[in-house]
Amino acid sequence: HIIGDIFDRGPRADRIMDELMAHAHVDIEWGNHDISWMGAAAGCPALIANVLRIALSYNSYDVLEDGYGLNLRPLSVFATEVYGDDPCERFLPHTLDDVVFDHVDAALTARMHKAIAVIQCKLEGQLLRAHPEYGMDGRRIFERCDFRRGTVMLDGVEYPLADTHFPTVDPDDPLA
């Protein structure tokens, strides 16, 4: 019996999954990160953005590029064009171990992380707006932001946003 979150236990979850699939009988209790990856593999745009964001936040290029063959170049080009002058300090990756080979610049990773985080917020907001039956209106955070003033309203209290540079967000329609 394997207790889940295989995709939240360190680097190269793809290799762990390959090893498990080689066994005839495996009993897995799936965790939330595992389910996110399944949803991404099934094509859910919000979950694709979610797993990309989490992987980038931990500098896990190996699982994305080597393990699953994802081409991150379009995201890196987009992030550089949109956030090239933004240090994206709040989006710097957490590094669990030193990358000796295939080092990726932390500033580029931060830009990519911020770009996919904004995309994820938009996609999740669109999904939740389209499905009020999910009962998750409390998760529609982007629509509670006042991007002109740089604030967010949570539980009736207005807070300043820690980051206010969002050139791809239309203040009148943040989910567009």
Go through each PLM region and give its residues:
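Feature recognizes metal-dependent phosphohydrolase scaffolds
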Residues: 1-176
